[in-house]
Amino acid sequence: MFGLFRRRAIAKAPARRTGDYGEEQAAAYLKQQGFRIRARNVQYEGREELDLVVEDRTTRRFIEVKTRRQLPGAESRYGTPMAAVASDKRRHILNAARRYTAAHPTRKTAQFDIVEVYLDPTCDAPRVLAVHHLQDAFRT
């Protein structure tokens, strides 16, 4: 009877694993470009979350990472990664950024970027085809 109440390990959904992998690749790319990773997967209640927070000398960037198993520039049923960051998603990112900044004040300029990670759609194992960093992708 008590066996019914045992917790079972639930495997992450494939889309979530793909997203996690994309975030790792985006962080590695940004680090290689000279940014310092300040935070990953910052979550507040509701849908407010920040995938990555990175900084350089003058700017704090709030990064939304979108990962797709598609060729760069190709259309998919989900549209382009950038198109997936619609007005509702942007509002959630802006609110999360305000909360993060209230908890971690800085004099640096805030900027909102999108990093698109493209994975080879023909491979089962993830293989990065391209990483596109769209700087200052949207404003407050």
Where are these regions (language model features)?
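Residues at secondary-structure transition points
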Residues: 17, 21, 47, 80, ...
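Interdomain/boundary linker segments immediately adjacent to catalytic/signaling cores
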Residues: 1-22, 28
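Catalytic cores of nucleic-acid endonucleases
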Residues: 67-122
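Short, low-complexity, polybasic intrinsically disordered segments
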Residues: 118-140
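Conserved catalytic cores of phosphodiester-cleaving nucleases, focusing on short active-site segments
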Residues: 30, 50-74, 93
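A short acidic/basic microdomain associated with nuclease active sites
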Residues: 31-46
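A generic fold-level signal
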Residues: 45-47, 55, 107-109, 126
